[in-house]
Structure formats: structure tokens, C-alpha cells
């Protein structure tokens, strides 16, 4: 009951509690999806309250963890984090959310992300955030020792299709900051 009280009302004095709950969103959703849908997820909606949404997305961004069911619930508001203005307000949290965006694309499938919204999100990221996202992808290529995680297999089946579908082609957003992870990707594969 106390948990519901802290989550369910919109009192600003309870916002720090909601931020902490947001940092454990995946865990809470796995334990009780109905309670989470009813009392926590509404605070992630940008159209409801920008200040509240910014706070809980920053909490979620401390250690973002996604599973396919949760992703389906939050992806629209998640992509809205990368709109002009909001991405700057998120500060360093934008980097961890960018990595979570890459993870969602690589692990949940290309069809779960709208192409234009995803390309727009990546385009609006600063070069350091895009480079961090690419470094995360390099890590995804080089983790593991079995066939399922062979870098060439991961490249061919997940990373290359993701890049082809979502990475913006605009030469205006390219930067030297992003060059190193592209090279590391090339070196990790044959």
C-alpha cells in the first residue's frame, strides 16, 4: 500500500521515490506488471508531465535493463527521450539510454523499432553519445566464446542489418569521435 501511495500520486515530494522505483523498472515489471503498468509507467509519459517524465527517465537511465515485454510498453516514450531539447535535459543519462536503444534493436528485432523515429533519435544525439552507442555494439560483437556469439555471426545477423536500417546517412552528423568504434567493429569481424 505504501509503495502504491508513493508511485500512484503525482505529488512532487514523492518524486525521488519514483525515480528510485524507475531505476528498478525492469525488476518491478517482471514481478508485478499490472501494478507497474498502473502506478509507475504513467510517470514515464512525456505528454502527462515533462518534469516528472524527465526525472523517472533519468532514474531508469542509471542502469537501463529491458526485456521484450517491458520494451513493448515503453518504446514510444523511450524514443521520445531523444527529441530536440529533451536529449540535452537528460544529460549523461542520454548515453546509457542510447546504449539501451542499440540493445533493443539488436536483441528484440528490427521490426520493434520505427525506422524514422530511431534514425531521428540517433541523429539528434551528440557525437560522444553516438560513439558510446557504437562502443556498446563493439562490446556486443566481442562478448562470448560460442557460435551464437561469434563476432561474424553477430555482425551478419544483427549488427549489420541494424546499422543498415537505422544508422543515419547524413554526412553532417559524422565526427572523428565515432571513427574509433567503427574501426573496432571492423577489426572484431572478418
Predicted regions span which residues?
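Non-catalytic all-alpha helical scaffold/repeat segments
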Residues: 1-190
Amino acid at each position: 500500500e505504501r509503495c502504491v501511495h508513493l508511485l500512484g500520486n503525482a505529488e512532487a515530494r514523492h518524486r525521488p521515490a519514483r525515480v528510485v522505483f524507475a531505476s528498478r523498472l525492469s525488476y518491478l515489471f517482471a514481478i508485478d506488471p499490472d501494478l507497474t503498468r498502473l502506478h509507475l509507467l504513467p510517470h514515464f509519459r512525456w505528454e502527462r508531465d515533462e518534469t516528472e517524465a524527465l526525472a523517472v527517465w533519468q532514474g531508469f537511465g542509471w542502469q537501463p535493463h529491458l526485456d521484450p515485454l517491458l520494451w513493448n510498453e515503453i518504446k514510444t516514450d523511450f524514443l521520445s527521450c531523444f527529441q530536440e531539447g529533451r536529449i540535452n535535459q537528460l544529460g549523461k543519462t542520454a548515453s546509457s539510454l542510447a546504449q539501451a536503444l542499440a540493445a533493443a534493436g539488436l536483441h528484440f528485432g528490427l521490426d520493434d523499432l520505427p525506422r524514422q523515429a530511431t534514425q531521428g533519435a540517433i541523429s539528434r544525439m551528440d557525437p560522444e553519445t553516438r560513439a558510446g552507442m557504437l562502443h556498446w555494439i563493439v562490446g556486443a560483437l566481442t562478448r562470448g566464446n560460442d557460435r551464437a556469439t561469434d563476432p561474424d555471426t553477430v555482425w551478419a545477423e544483427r549488427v549489420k542489418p541494424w546499422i543498415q536500417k537505422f544508422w543515419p546517412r547524413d554526412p553532417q552528423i559524422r565526427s572523428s569521435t565515432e571513427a574509433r568504434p567503427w574501426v573496432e567493429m571492423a577489426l572484431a569481424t572478418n
